[in-house]
Amino acid sequence: MKSDFLTSTTHFNPSIFLPKIPSRNSRISIKSSSSSSKVRPDPWSLSDGNPEKPKPRYERPKHPLSDDDARRIIKKKAQYLSTLRRNQGSQAMTPKWIKRTPEQMVQYLEDDRNGQMYGKHVVAAIKTVRGLSQRRQGSDDMRFVMSSFVAKLSFRDMCVVLKEQRGWRQVRDFFSWMKLQLSYRPSVVVYTIVLRLYGQVGKIKMAEETFLEMLEVGCEPDAVACGTMLCTYARWGRHSAMLTFYKAVQERRILLSTSVYNFMLSSLQKKSFHGKVIDLWLEMVEEGVPPNEFTYTLVVSSYAKQGFKEEALKAFGEMKSLGFVPEEVTYSSVISLSVKAGDWEKAIGLYEDMRSQGIVPSNYTCATMLSLYYKTENYPKALSLFADMERNKIPADEVIRGLIIRIYGKLGLFHDAQSMFEETERLNLLADEKTYLAMSQVHLNSGNVVKALDVIEMMKTRDIPLSRFAYIVMLQCYAKIQNVDCAEEAFRALSKTGLPDASSCNDMLNLYTRLNLGEKAKGFIKQIMVDQVHFDIELYKTAMRVYCKEGMVAEAQDLIVKMGREARVKDNRFVQTLAESMHIVNKHDKHEAVLNVSQLDVMALGLMLNLRLKEGNLNETKAILNLMFKTDLGSSAVNRVISSFVREGDVSKAEMIADIIIRLGLRMEEETIATLIAVYGRQHKLKEAKRLYLAAGESKTPGKSVIRSMIDAYVRCGWLEDAYGLFMESAEKGCDPGAVTISILVNALTNRGKHREAEHISRTCLEKNIELDTVGYNTLIKAMLEAGKLQCASEIYERMHTSGVPCSIQTYNTMISVYGRGLQLDKAIEIFSNARRSGLYLDEKIYTNMIMHYGKGGKMSEALSLFSEMQKKGIKPGTPSYNMMVKICATSRLHHEVDELLQAMERNGRCTDLSTYLTLIQVYAESSQFAEAEKTITLVKEKGIPLSHSHFSSLLSALVKAGMMEEAERTYCKMSEAGISPDSACKRTILKGYMTCGDAEKGILFYEKMIRSSVEDDRFVSSVVEDLYKAVGKEQDV
């Protein structure tokens, strides 16, 4: 209101004595005039002069305060109360210290206010009227209750009493009594008070009647009264009445305040009447009412909700230009609007501006920005924003978590996506189908179709209804694992939700094509055409591929016509190429028409060639090929068509096209020739491969790819000499066939025992500085190791090291074997140390290799230590490793360690098989540990392991060599006792032993006793026996 009186008054509250606020600096030291001692009185109170309550006595009495000190204390208390009142806001309960004229002071004393805001009679009247609210309605008459206040209350006092009421009935009754008083005079002020109180409790009908009464008594409503009425309508959602009343106010040219407009705008926006908010805002601007921060917040939000981007940004800019700092919700509105409008740079700029203001974004704003970063594939920014959310403790809802799962999936962080999904489930935030499907798609993209289907199954068990999109994802899963039945079931379920989309139809058609289900594919195309599914270009391509593969010329022609009529695809290169190449021979000037096509589609040409080849129409095929070679794309298009046939496994068509091209005298590209040669090599068609190779060499020198494929074909067909010759020839010409081809060739030569040729290739690679990769160097080193060329292997390794090619674990393992075989144990140890420092995972193979060379070098402590280290690192030795350890320990006469190793094998589930004990017997025999060898044979027999000639032959041979013929004879007899018939080798060995020892007679006796009856025409045994008889001068008895 404009009244000075009402603006100078505040709400009535009971008198409350506030406690003093303690302060460290609140105590004031007052010096006495006669002493330097300090006292600390209460600075906020003065003596009331009451002799019955004297001040406390002190040791040293205080002198009376001077006038200056009294004024200073009064001012201090005034400042304190002023500060307290400001801190309490509009509900301040402390009296206001004001300056009064002498006349006002006289009136103040007459009112007997005693420091209160109103006089005692006014306070009493307020309490009396308020007290009526506790009585039953109609039980008391206001005239009777207020009879004691007649002629005591001025008009202003009555307004104060009216203003301080809380119940609408008391307001109504008191206002009626007030109008009967002599001091009453009709005023817009008093009517405004009544309107405000009625409006607060929703008595709109009574407010309207009061407003009409105000007009009838001749009071012209001002801006405050009209604003009060408008706020009442707005508060209680009477928008139609509010806008009607607002039009009436405009007609009276009453200028409303900003707060009234804000009230109306806020009320309209709460009910989502954003169009009316905008209209009211424009009228507000037209009236020249200055908006404040809250006004702009409402208007920007309504513009954003209506999708008016330019207007919202303009209002937002005006808001900032006036010095207002937008709230987070305002920034969020314009950011979201910019993202929806596709103005991504503006959205990012607004977000960065908001962050520069120190405003922490809400999770809705973060979700909007994450969606933007996801659309623009700016995944690092998205993850950075998510990290900021965690740092600022902004709660991530399910929408945000779903976006992060998708982003993790796009980045290949499948484990992180799974962790986020599980965390969302743990927090009980997992409820939306989109989150489940996001996780399912991540699993699908990672190739884990089973997990993708598990997520969808989880949705079903939790009674989450499957949407159309869920069936699409299910179809993609089943199509990927080629489960036709389930895919068809998912497609039928999708069809029940509406017309299937082109992408899903394409998935089904591709599934039928991959599984060569031609009849199903044709039936499916027919059905979706009947259902009038909207084809996209990809679905058209797949359908055309089916028709061409099945040789359905008529259907293909109809499909081309259909594509040519559709505005969405008729300008596509694929469609244009098909249309132009359908009937080349029968069309006049077809060559010119095709040349007018800016670019031919390779896939379309391949389909047409496929169709004509399937049809057997060679004339059309030749015409298409001739035409393609005359276009701007030249041979590259044809070569890509041939390559596509090879990739799809349709080699016969590729061969046919290649034959036609050669007969027509046209030239294929090297990559295509190399591809076909490789195919011929895999099929062992060396004659055809050589024909293509020679055709390629007629025009120019074959390139690397052709030579590489030809060498590979030679190797596959077993023509290693030709492969070797081609490599050496190409190397002389400076052509490098590549590391892979060299590896294949050297490996093949090594396996066939052609070590000289392998060495020549290795030397050539070093001399010509041919670039090799890790696998290539490994192959050469291994080949030289097997050829026994240890120095060459060492040179290759040094070249590999100086060239900066990284070593693999195979490199280190092979070099340990090279230096170990060359008795260079120190270098082998150095290589093993390099392998440790490389950071590569050391496997059982390299440990076993190093342990073996330690054993051969006599360093058993190092071998045992390394074997223990291998086990500590979690590598469980296999049977070969244990056999090797048993062998080197037995050789070094470490019998205790051998027993422990055998026991460890049994504990770790490594079976001590025939080879284990055979190795042990051979080692014992070779190292002249005959007793241990015999014990081992006995142990094998006790374990029930079947014995063989091999177990005895090595021991028998060692005993014979040592001249221990009696032990040898005993071993021979044990063999017979074990049920093993000695073979010719054992017989020869023991008989030669008798001859060597010069004891021919014993040899003859042993022969006649043990062997003679079992010799079956063995000429080698017979020869030894003949020598025995000659030695004693006897003739052999026949």
UniProtKB/Swiss-Prot annotation:
The keyword Lipid biosynthesis does not apply. InterPro entries: Pentatricopeptide_rpt, TPR-like_helical_dom_sf. Residues 50-69 have a biased composition (Basic and acidic residues). Residues 23-38 have a biased composition (Low complexity). GO terms for molecular function: mRNA binding. Residues 23-69 are annotated as: Disordered. PPR repeats lie at residues 187-221, 222-256, 257-291, 292-326, 327-361, 362-396, 397-431, 432-466, 467-501, 502-535, 536-570, 601-631, 634-668, 669-699, 703-737, 738-772, 773-807, 808-842, 843-877, 878-912, 913-947, 948-982, 983-1017. GO terms for biological process: chloroplast mRNA processing; Group II intron splicing. NCBIfam families: PPR. This is Pentatricopeptide repeat-containing protein At5g27270.
